[in-house]
Amino acid sequence: MGKEPAAKRREYFPRLLQLVLEHPRVLVVSADHVGSKQLAGIRVALRGQATVLMGKNTKIRTALRQQLQQQPQLQALLPLVRLNVGFIFCRADPAAVRAVVQQHKVPAPAKQGVTAPTDVFIPAGPTGMDPGSTGFFQALGISTKIVKGQIEIQQAVQLIRRGERVSASAATLLHKLSVKPFTYGLKVEHVYDNGSVYSASVLDITDEQILEAFAAGAANVAAVSRAVGLPSAAAAPHSILEAFRNCAALCLDTPFCFPQMQRLKEMVENPAAFAAAAAPAAAAPAAAPAAAAKAPEPEEEEEEDGDMGFSLFD
């Protein structure tokens, strides 16, 4: 039996190093209050997308240090190996992997001494508890009354605040009310990507936000380039347009001209000629409906036919 842990340790090191070599993107997760059954469900859900690897911190640090000479970028992972930590080696997009992980949170009761991850409120109304349990409510400062043989909370109250430790009275009361106020699961703390470490919040950034930020940055570069007179790719379209406007103004005010401005300059110098040339073109479409309106006049031929018929009897 004594050799089994050593054998597992020898298998763990090459497996961790192989996963690090094959997966440049890693999610560093905390696994507080996560049970083995819940962890097994996450592994099944991530099959084909990612690999979950847990282990003791000392083993993880030892394995990473052994690989530092070949992969010095792994140094960035060492400070993250603390408390109850685990790695998710991603084959799919890390944001998609995190979404799967977040779907596998389970409700859990509030245990005494546990730090509350969220605020806990008790709503007003009947509790289903008999009057003999009023001591729990009194110890917590919750006002109650007896209605139809059961305890009823008069108004909603905040029982536990986020970050505080759960007291024995609060844990007992929530247990009696059959309330499981907390949800636990793997929590993504950091993202490791080819030697760089980012906060998990980077996974919330969308493609649209990246495009908006890039467009705003390009606009700022163009504005600065134009202000200081320094050419840049972002400012080139604006600079070319402004230069063309300056050339156009120069052509209109001086004898100088170039082919692209020749017709415009002639229009400015002799607007009457262009107005006269444009008048027939504008009148032609207007004359077409008038001609179409006069078309139905041949009905007078019927009257002539009638006169000719009556003249035969004269």
From Swiss-Prot:
The protein's job, in short, is: Ribosomal protein P0 is the functional equivalent of E.coli protein L10.
Region spans: Disordered: 288-314
Q: Does the keyword Cell wall biogenesis/degradation apply?
A: no
- GO annotations under biological process? cytoplasmic translation; ribosomal large subunit assembly
State the organism of origin: Eimeria tenella (Coccidian parasite)
Q: Which PANTHER family match?
A: 60S ACIDIC RIBOSOMAL PROTEIN P0, LARGE RIBOSOMAL SUBUNIT PROTEIN UL10
PTM comment for this protein? Phosphorylated.
Q: Which InterPro entries match?
A: Ribosomal_protein_uL10, Ribosomal_uL10, Ribosomal_uL10-like_insert, Ribosomal_uL10-like_insert_sf, Ribosomal_uL10-like_sf, uL10_eukaryotes
Query: Does Phosphoprotein count among this protein's keywords?
Result: yes
| Pfam families according to UniProt | Ribosomal_60s, Ribosomal_L10, RL10P_insert
GO CC, sorted alphabetically, is:
cytosolic large ribosomal subunit
Q: Which UniProt keywords apply?
A: Phosphoprotein, Ribonucleoprotein, Ribosomal protein
**Protein family according to the UniProt entry:** Belongs to the universal ribosomal protein uL10 family.
For this UniProt entry, the molecular function terms from Gene Ontology, in alphabetical order, are: large ribosomal subunit rRNA binding; structural constituent of ribosome
Q: Report quaternary structure and partners.
A: P0 forms a pentameric complex by interaction with dimers of P1 and P2.
What's the protein called, per UniProt? Large ribosomal subunit protein uL10
**Biased composition range(s): Acidic residues:** 298-307
